[in-house]
Amino acid sequence: MCGIIGYTGPLEARDLLLNGLAGLEYRGYDSAGIAYFNTDSQVRIIKNVGKVAALRECVNKTGDVSHCGIGHTRWATHGGVTDENAHPHRAGQVTLIHNGIIENYHQLTQAYGLQDKLVSQTDSEVAAWVLDAVYEDSGRDPLAAIRTFIKKLSGSYGFCILFDDRPGEIYAVRNVSPLVAAYTRSGALVASDLTALISYTKEYFVVPEGHIVRLTPYKVRVYDMEYNRIEPEMLEVSWNMDAAMKNGFPHFMLKEIHEQPEALRNTILPRLSGNLPDFTADGIPDELFLNCNQIRIIACGTAMHAGIVAKALMEPLLRIPVTVSIASEFRYEDPLVDEKTLAIVISQSGETIDTLAAMRLARSLGAPALSIVNVKGSTIARESDYVFYTHAGPEIAVASTKAYSVQLAALYMLCCRMALTRGCCNKAEAGQFMEDLLAVIPAMETMIGRSDQIKSFIRHLIRERDTFFIGRLSLIHI
């Protein structure tokens, strides 16, 4: 997972890129770098191992001014943590940054004879050299070159690209890996995450897969693979910049722990009719729950653990099989899935690559997909048959807190509605389930209010060599 950002416009690009990278640093902090056109329309690259603060020191030592550039913060996948492996990568006329994995990079290295050209151990540099070759072959036509280029790639990618002879322009393209873009009075922006854009605009669009985006200081254009211009669907961010700031907390994780009660309220209360769960506004019909004879929960990481808790709740109540699969393995299981299977897909970002691929497989086998996601307009949300949006706001800390809590709440509400619809409980029992769920909110506020007591307890706990966390049934998995 890496963070990427691009900007072209009237503002000073280097400061904007560095500020954007600071907001994306949770996506990677092994190394960071920027590339930009200077006042002589030459591309300059500055990159180093370490955090964005170290990069900022290097950038500030130069006297350059720029109005167009790209930036990247990295978690290493291909190649170690070195200056050479840091992005951006340059090859001939091409400078690019990349988020994703090029699975056929070795074959491309052989096919293009790149063994003696490469200065890094990354798949991304291989991609840069391939694009440079097809750029020359295309007569230096960016759209034609990028179309040819992506046909040669296997894997996931989000690219931002500078061409030496196109100062002031940025080109972007993606497959699976997330990219969002926007045009504002301050210029044109593209990034891997909304947190890098929110200071400048609340309106944005998700870059469509297999489409090319051309950013100039005055406009953003989106083209399909036949070079037809398309108008992307514009979306609006539902949270403000304060939600992406620490606001006096020492770190994002503590801030997001304190935000859990409000996140639960925002997720639960709009979906209550009387004291019963109601998904009419979400467009989730009761027929979906009546027509299934098994449930497959598909997720990764923390979201998968939320799914395991849900299985412990659902199976005894609904009396149908519930299977939880880690998304990265689902494709290799030869899963028993058909149109009578309800696939519940969980992803905070809505862009988790393995989860997206698993959902696509489940849908291809006939299963309707109901996704639980936190980001409006994300790829998983757009490709699902039905969406349950949680309303946790941005979660920036790597360790999940409020996103996990609202995922549990969403699954609990879905379980309650399924049980009511299938006759596994009556309205009084369903109402009691929801009262129990709502009681979690004040209980959580009480616990957060005891921070000083908890700190005192933790001082004793950290001295212990062994700690046992004991639970039964669903609590085991929490």
Segments predicted by a language model, with ranges:
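Short acidic (Asp/Glu) and glycine-rich catalytic loops that position anionic groups and cofactors
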Residues: 1, 108, 174, 243-246, ...
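Conserved short alpha-helical segments that host acidic/polar catalytic motifs at enzyme active sites
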Residues: 1-251, 255, 259-294, 332, ...
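Cofactor-binding loop segments of dinucleotide-utilizing enzymes, especially the Rossmann-like FAD-
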Residues: 7-9, 39, 99-101, 164, ...
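Short beta-strand segments
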Residues: 71-72, 97-98, 160-162, 173-174, ...
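Conserved beta-strand elements of the Class I
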Residues: 95, 171, 296, 342-344, ...
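Conserved adenylation A10 loop of the ANL superfamily
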Residues: 257, 477-478
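Glycine-rich phosphate-binding loops that contact phosphosugars or nucleotide phosphates
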Residues: 290-439, 476
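Acidic catalytic cores of enzymes that act on phosphate-bearing nucleotides/polynucleotides
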Residues: 462-475
